[in-house]
């Protein structure tokens, strides 16, 4: 399998509790390299664009409000089979269902405040990365 990139967001529920370093440690221990990272305050327009796939869902407004409620850390991760690897490291969306040792089991507050986002496909990873990073922002 070739080296692949995926996109990650450390969400406001985690940044407000100063968990970025602890989450990064789990990411790196799993063999994922952080090749791009920045802490930002997402705007409403950015959050609405990022989560536009959910715009017709009843939770869309709450999701956008949550994502702009505090700083987030956007990241590009790299490894062989990075998308699958990171999704395994994140754990199930609902932390109650997440496996022991996963980011969501360790740090998430609830299904809504579940600490991290990760791309679900190579196509979405490319689109999500491009929303926040240029190739010049990333290291090898």
Swiss-Prot record:
Quaternary structure, from the entry: Homotetramer.
Listed HAMAP family: NDP_kinase
Reactions listed under catalytic activity: a 2'-deoxyribonucleoside 5'-diphosphate + ATP = a 2'-deoxyribonucleoside 5'-triphosphate + ADP; a ribonucleoside 5'-diphosphate + ATP = a ribonucleoside 5'-triphosphate + ADP
Sequence intervals crossing the membrane: none
Protein name: Nucleoside diphosphate kinase
Subcellular location: Cytoplasm
GO biological process annotation, one example: GTP biosynthetic process
Gene: ndk
Organism: Hyphomonas neptunium (strain ATCC 15444)
